Amino acid sequence: MGSAIVMTVGILLGLLLGQGKAGRNVLFESILNAVTAIPPIAYLIIFISTWGNSVSTMVVALTVSLILRMIKLVKTKTELEYSKAYVLCAVASGASRFRILLVHILPNLIRDAFRFSCLSAGEMILSISGFSFIGLSLGEGVIDWGSMVSEGRTSFGLAPGLVLYPMLFIFLCVLSFNLLGRQLEAGGRIDA
């Protein structure tokens, strides 16, 4: 759910901000660079200390952080695509900005957006599992892999599966998202 929101909002805002001249608003770009330099884990710490630890707080914190990074990615890619010959030809032929964004630019950056979403899904899983492992779980009654690993540590000698199986599932889940992202990256680009 969080990755779908990241992708949708990030693509829309990134396309809107990236159209036109690159670097036209230096202040906005500086602010965007500053907020994307903050790691997602820092957003998570700030949100948890402000609103308490719950599922919604963790998802919102990671989603906000990743939306900002997606906006920066899509904005940069949009600015790069706008300078290419096929977009200049579309502008010269009288195509509207909406048509240029939808038909010419979006297909060329969608793979990067999907790749980023796959990698960010793995990052969300690792962050939430890590925070649950150190005791900042998702709340009472919510079971997740990080808290399962943390609770299983005390009986690791007697039942190592209580730690190893959740760790294996974290590993496999993150690996599958990373492999999916790599496969999308290897797919190449679409030249319109």
Where do the protein language model's features map onto the residues?
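Membrane-cytosol interface at the C-terminal ends of specific transmembrane alpha-helices
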Residues: 3, 49, 53-102, 112-120
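Hydrophobic alpha-helical segments of membrane proteins
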Residues: 3-4, 8, 46, 113-121, ...
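Generic hydrophobic transmembrane alpha-helix motif, especially the helices
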Residues: 9, 22-69, 80
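Short amphipathic alpha-helical coupling elements at transmembrane boundaries
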Residues: 26-36, 47, 76, 88-92, ...
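C-terminal transmembrane helix and the adjacent membrane-cytosol boundary/short C-terminal tail
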Residues: 64-65, 111, 117-118, 160-192
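Hydrophobic alpha-helical transmembrane segments of polytopic membrane proteins
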Residues: 7, 44-49, 133, 145-181
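Transmembrane alpha-helix boundary and packing residues in multipass membrane permease domains
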Residues: 15, 45-49, 58, 62, ...
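Transmembrane alpha-helix signature in integral membrane proteins
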Residues: 1-19
